């Protein structure tokens, strides 16, 4: 089953080791986990996230938390005449977080802070199921194929273009269209339109 809601569980900065093991197993099985009614501050979010691997500092430093640069703000809120977060009011195309890096993110932990009264939904897709649904001849054709991942193309379509320093940190890169999950084994289809320029 794609996606699971974990009930009656409070995330903490220093969880028990058995809780981390259980969360990892659930995450591997369901690919997406939802924890409602949490009371994290930014330090807690970073501390909890570190239990799942090294944290990437996003290339868009102007939208990072000053106290905890591991956190990227996604927001349309303005302070002192400027937006505090990336993407603003744009409807973002389907994408794989940080697929434009040599080593793409294994996952993302999103925490909702200030929500609009309606809309603002975040949608997720099971890309293993998407791969499984492809005709066998298409899978054969795509096996081993690469797609050009361009963070600059993403920004031109959905956000504010990067500066020269940011461009240097995120050059275009080729990644396989089909990737095998390192833990559970199923193949995932990573060809999502937001970052690709050419297959």
Q: What are these model-predicted stretches?
A:
Residues 1-193:
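Non-heme Fe(II) oxygenase catalytic core, chiefly the N-lobe of the double-stranded beta-helix
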Residues 196-199:
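Single conserved hydrophobic/aromatic residue that forms the stacking wall/gate
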